[in-house]
């Protein structure tokens, strides 16, 4: 069953029982961000649901972090954009004085967009149906394939995406400006440019990464 992440940041864990008892004692393995699609792969246990991410990672996420059923299916087919500000608030009005509909959407979160931007603001819809406005410059296209065909431009775009996380503290399993790990940084930098690589720091068959010699390193290459 398809589902959509319905909160700003949803922790992914491998131990649902321990997480249900004490989240602080259960290891975080990944973070799923608002608007990301997942596949539910089994039955809920202690309010946790087993899922597979769109990039093949598996784990357990809180049941109340998911939107399922027809609403999820309807939202997934709407035009979407991705947040590229480190943090962004969805407001009730297209001005800074608007009340906050949803606070703290992280870099990498996804929203559905309604129409074209007006006066620097973009009308958006969240997975749960709430609507509001984001600054248009806080959003970028959600690329289904590499954002640039020219290799040098693509490499530069990947490096620029990585720089958006400058100053972010290290957090095992993290994937946002609140905290990110090494493979999370690599994955998000590539994903923002339309390339989906494996979540962990390793070469994995079926993902667009191949070995390169350190003497041939160029901008945008990964060093594991």
Residue ranges of model-derived segments:
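Structural motif
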Residues: 36, 109, 220-221
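Surface-exposed patches in mature extracellular/periplasmic domains of secreted proteins
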Residues: 170-174, 199-201
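Short, well-ordered loop/turn sites that connect or cap secondary structure elements
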Residues: 26, 32, 105, 216-217
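...with weaker cross-activation on analogous glycine-rich loops/strands in unrelated enzymes
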Residues: 195-224
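Active-site nucleophilic cysteine motif
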Residues: 162, 174-193
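Boundary regions of SH3-family modules and the immediately adjacent low-complexity/disordered segments
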Residues: 1-10, 23, 30, 34-39, ...
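Short, conserved secondary-structure segments in the cores of folded domains
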Residues: 28, 100-101, 210-213
């Amino acid at each position: 069953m398809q589902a959509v992440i319905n909160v700003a940041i949803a922790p992914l864990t491998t131990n649902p029982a321990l997480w249900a008892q004490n989240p602080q004692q259960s290891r975080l393995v990944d973070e799923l961000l608002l608007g990301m699609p997942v596949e539910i792969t089994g039955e809920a246990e202690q309010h946790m649901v087993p899922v597979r991410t769109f990039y093949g990672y598996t784990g357990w996420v809180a049941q109340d972090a998911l939107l399922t059923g027809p609403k999820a299916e309807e939202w997934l087919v709407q035009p979407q954009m991705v947040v590229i500000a480190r943090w962004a608030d969805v407001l009730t009005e297209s001005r800074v004085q608007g009340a906050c509909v949803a606070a703290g959407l992280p870099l990498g979160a996804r929203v559905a967009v309604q129409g074209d931007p007006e006066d620097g603001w973009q009308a958006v819809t969240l997975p749960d149906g709430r609507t509001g406005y984001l600054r248009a410059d806080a959003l970028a296209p959600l690329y289904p394939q590499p954002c640039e065909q020219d290799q040098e431009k693509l490499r530069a775009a990947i490096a620029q995406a990585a720089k958006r996380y400058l100053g972010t503290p290290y957090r095992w399993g993290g994937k946002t400006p609140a905290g990110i790990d090494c493979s999370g940084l690599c994955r998000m930098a590539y994903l923002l440019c339309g390339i989906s690589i494996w979540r962990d720091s390793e070469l994995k068959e079926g993902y667009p990464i191949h070995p390169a010699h350190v003497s041939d390193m160029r901008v945008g290459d990964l060093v594991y």
